[in-house]
Curated annotation (Swiss-Prot):
Substrate binds at H222. The modification N6-carboxylysine is found at K220. The lineage of its organism: Bacteria, Bacillati, Bacillota, Bacilli, Bacillales. GO terms for molecular function: nickel cation binding; urease activity. The keyword NADP does not apply. This is Urease subunit alpha. Heterotrimer of UreA (gamma), UreB (beta) and UreC (alpha) subunits. Three heterotrimers associate to form the active enzyme. GO terms for cellular component: cytoplasm.
Length: 571
């Protein structure tokens, strides 16, 4: 029996050479490799393959390699490749990406990918699977952010705060041992991976060390607490000794020094620069030049992604609120005006597309939207495809695979590497926590179908619970069983520093979630960033704000209409 490509795709999803459009964007993926076996595909349903003695083994037990969950015939988008495969999950982790089923009657089934009586199935045919997103710039202002974030496909949130305190509304810091311990206790209640940054603004080491020993996974330097060269040097020295990351929001007003002074204080040590363009804060007008340095891991926040006709006006109002400024004080208004520059925001689009800026995050409720990291990432990718055409690496191939890998890396693997958690999350790879997001291609980047947390469904598009089937309206993202009870603790991780784990902080606090410590935070560089490791020379004119990359001026026009927008949000 032979199937046409169209018939095969409708039954089992696309295969090598098939192309899929991502929602209403101009981005096309092409399957690079198919790990399934033609004619022996797994498929669940009445009269289908995954039945006893057929695609499901009648004899193998869980201890003999039977999976807890198989996602069949999934299209995977990951920095590692764009492939078609079955995904095998056991004990909450990915154990196989390849061919699952019954090895007694099917070709190519791997010994760790056996489907048996212990196996649940998710039909991945025609769906796209990505790693759960990582938002590495969270102001923990309200716990309700977590519901919005996970519903959008974010499964790991890193940042700081203690709730709607004035300091947290402006800065991403959980300051001091007592506050860190309380936030670690609160983390048990949520079905996402969490990690907290301490306050890095101190010019002596002891106040910084005690926060890392209390459980902080890193330190945040913020201008509202005084990001002076002395504080920068001290913070990085402590981080180097204790193997944690430092995130920085530099001195917009250039009070304690200019961007050159900050670069000198950083030296050759690795650092994560938040909202590197500068609208979210940082040396005006030229903080973005740090994005070209080999030891700087730069990120954007999502309100400037992508550059549109509304970006500038929105930012001025946001800034006044977030940084506790008074519109009646001329100096406060001047502070706000100095940060919002159309020229550098336009250049930020290009730098994202060139792989110079390596990450995208939210800046949640503090000049950023927690549920829009993923959607704005893909809006930026689409805007750049429309304005700049295919990347050089994609020229002549008829697909956008390199661009797609570049952009998915910005909110998955790269923040994981930056903050020392890439052994656990950040990609669709064997051994990692099964934090996976399943998308209907028509809604890719906008509304996930399923969000798996540690191998269990935590959120899903779900219809009326009183209906006779799951699909009747109203259909929207709702919490599932992985979001409740003790399941949250076995399917999610609270990240600590190694110092805190060695001191037994998790045991002293009685934390219920899985615990893991960050590592290799200080041995990385820009070269560690997947598909986003470019280090060109960046210059910003101090009067016109024009941006040059390796001597060539870069800019783009703002869009009046973007993809993934109003047609998806009619209700």
């Amino acid at each position: 029996m032979k199937l046409t490509r169209a018939q095969h795709a409708s039954l089992y999803g696309p295969t090598v050479g098939d192309k899929v459009r991502l929602a209403d964007t101009d981005l096309l993926l092409e399957i690079e490799k198919d790990y399934t076996v033609y004619g022996d595909e797994c498929k669940f349903g009445g009269g289908k393959v995954l039945r006893d003695g057929m695609g499901q083994s009648a004899v193998y037990t869980r201890d003999e390699g039977v999976l807890d969950l198989i996602i069949t015939n999934a299209t995977i988008i990951d920095y590692t490749g764009i492939v078609k495969a079955d995904i095998g999950i056991k004990d909450g982790h990915i154990v196989g990406i390849g061919k699952g089923g019954n090895p007694d009657i099917m070709d190519g089934v791997e010994s760790h990918m056996i489907v048996g009586a212990s196996t649940e199935a998710i039909a991945g045919e025609g769906l796209i699977v990505t790693a759960g997103g990582i938002d590495a710039h969270i102001h923990f202002i309200s716990p309700q952010q977590i519901d919005v974030a996970i519903a959008s496909g974010i499964t790991t949130m890193l940042g700081g705060g203690t709730g709607p305190a004035t300091g947290t509304k402006a800065t991403t810091c959980t300051p001091g041992k007592w506050n860190i311990e309380r936030m670690l206790e609160a983390a048990d209640a949520f079905p996402v991976n969490l990690g907290f940054l301490g306050k890095g603004n101190a010019s002596t080491p002891a106040p910084l060390r005690e926060q890392i020993e209390a459980g902080a996974i890193g330190l945040k330097l913020h201008e509202d607490w005084g990001t002076t060269p002395a504080a920068i040097r001290t913070c990085l020295s402590v981080a180097d000794r204790m193997d944690v990351q430092v995130a920085i929001h530099t001195d917009t007003l250039n009070e304690a020094g200019f961007v050159e002074d900050t670069i000198k204080a950083i030296g050759d040590r690795v650092i994560h620069t938040y909202h590197t363009e500068g609208a979210g804060g940082g040396h005006a007008p030229d903080i973005m030049k740090v994005a070209g340095l080999p030891n700087v891991l730069p990120s954007s926040t999502n309100p400037t992604r992508p550059f549109t006709v509304n970006t500038i006006d929105e930012h001025l109002d946001m800034l006044m609120v977030c940084h506790h400024l008074d519109p009646n004080v001329p100096e406060d208004v001047a502070f706000a005006d100095s940060r919002i520059r159309p020229e550098t925001i336009a250049a930020e689009d290009i730098l994202q597309d060139l792989g110079v800026i390596s990450m995208i995050s939210s800046d949640s409720q503090a000049m950023g939207r927690v549920g829009e990291v993923i959607i704005r990432t893909w809006q930026t990718a689409d805007k750049m495809k429309k304005q700049r055409g295919a990347l050089a690496e994609d020229q002549g191939k008829g697909n956008d695979n390199v661009r797609i890998k570049r952009y998915v890396s910005k909110y998955t693997i790269n923040p994981a590497i930056t903050h020392g958690i890439d052994d656990y999350v950040g990609s669709v790879e064997v051994g990692k926590l099964a934090d996976l997001v399943l998308w209907d291609p028509r809604f890719f980047g906008v509304k996930p179908e399923l969000i798996l947390k540690g191998g269990l469904i935590a959120y899903s598009q779900m219809g009326d619970p009183n209906a006779s089937i799951p699909t009747p309206q109203p259909v929207f993202s709702r919490p599932m069983f992985g979001s409740f009870g003790r399941a949250r603790g076995t399917t999610s991780i609270t990240f600590l520093s190694k110092a805190a784990m060695d001191l037994g902080v998790h045991e002293a606090l009685g934390l219920q979630k899985k615990i893991a410590h960050v590592k290799n935070c200080r041995s990385i560089s820009k070269r560690s960033m997947k598909y986003n490791d470019a280090t060109p020379n960046i210059e910003i004119d101090p009067e016109t704000y024009e941006v040059k990359v390796d001597g060539e001026m870069i800019t783009c026009k703002p869009f009046e209409e973007v993809a993934l927008a109003q047609r998806y949000f009619l209700f």
